């Protein structure tokens, strides 16, 4: 059973009852997942950006968007409009597919993993976590990477507060630490 069908058939009715909501449309759901990677080294190394774009496309199954600097910062040696990162916004079936692979395959592969931090909510039910290396994803092989880079993953939900967001992610299988 995929994560999407599990959400519709078992998680949504359970959350409706647990959160004491009156309507099925009030139940929180995952709206989108943003996967972002900042690449300060892309200013001097154009191959880093290209490799990063390919990795993001492999991990998410969707082409990454190049993020560019809004203004020049001399201390960081960047000019306005320089490529300094890449981002992917996942929605729909790709989002559920990525979440399922991330929760069930990637997170358990983190060294000394004891669960994700339950305090990383933003106050509006959205959850953000950082990943230190891309090797936790089974699609990335150690031989094909040039350097280890991390990424930020933001899960945007329709929850109105952190308690609803945490209940949703816990039901989806997110392993929170105590």
From Swiss-Prot:
Key words of the record: Ribonucleoprotein, Ribosomal protein, RNA-binding, rRNA-binding, tRNA-binding
InterPro entries for the chain: Ribosomal_uL5, Ribosomal_uL5_bac-type, Ribosomal_uL5_C, Ribosomal_uL5_CS, Ribosomal_uL5_dom_sf, Ribosomal_uL5_N
UniProt xrefs under PROSITE patterns: RIBOSOMAL_L5
GO CC list: ribonucleoprotein complex; ribosome
GO biological process, one term: translation
GO MF, one annotated term: structural constituent of ribosome
Entry superkingdom: Bacteria
HAMAP family: Ribosomal_uL5_B
Subunit: Part of the 50S ribosomal subunit; part of the 5S rRNA/L5/L18/L25 subcomplex. Contacts the 5S rRNA and the P site tRNA. Forms a bridge to the 30S subunit in the 70S ribosome.
Family: Belongs to the universal ribosomal protein uL5 family.
Job description of the protein: This is one of the proteins that bind and probably mediate the attachment of the 5S RNA into the large ribosomal subunit, where it forms part of the central protuberance. In the 70S ribosome it contacts protein S13 of the 30S subunit (bridge B1b), connecting the 2 subunits; this bridge is implicated in subunit movement. Contacts the P site tRNA; the 5S rRNA and some of its associated proteins might help stabilize positioning of ribosome-bound tRNAs.
Name recorded for this polypeptide: Large ribosomal subunit protein uL5
Native organism: Prochlorococcus marinus (strain MIT 9515)
């Amino acid at each position: 059973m995929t994560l999407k069908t599990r959400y519709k058939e078992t998680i949504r009715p359970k959350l409706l009852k647990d959160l004491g909501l009156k309507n099925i449309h009030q139940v929180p759901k995952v709206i989108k997942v943003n996967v972002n990677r900042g690449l300060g080294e892309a200013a001097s190394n154009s191959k880093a950006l290209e490799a990063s774009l390919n990795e993001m496309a492999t991990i998410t199954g969707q082409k990454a968007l190049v993020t560019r600097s809004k203004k020049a910062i001399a201390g960081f040696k960047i000019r306005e409009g320089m490529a300094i990162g890449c981002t992917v916004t996942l929605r729909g079936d790709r989002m559920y597919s990525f979440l399922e692979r991330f929760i069930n395959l990637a997170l358990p592969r983190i060294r000394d993993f004891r669960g994700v931090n339950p305090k990383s909510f933003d106050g509006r039910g959205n959850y953000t976590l950082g990943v230190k290396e891309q090797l936790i994803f089974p699609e990335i092989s150690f031989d094909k990477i040039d350097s280890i880079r991390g990424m930020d993953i933001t899960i945007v939900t329709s929850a109105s507060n952190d308690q609803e967001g945490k209940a949703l992610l816990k039901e989806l299988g997110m392993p929170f630490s105590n």
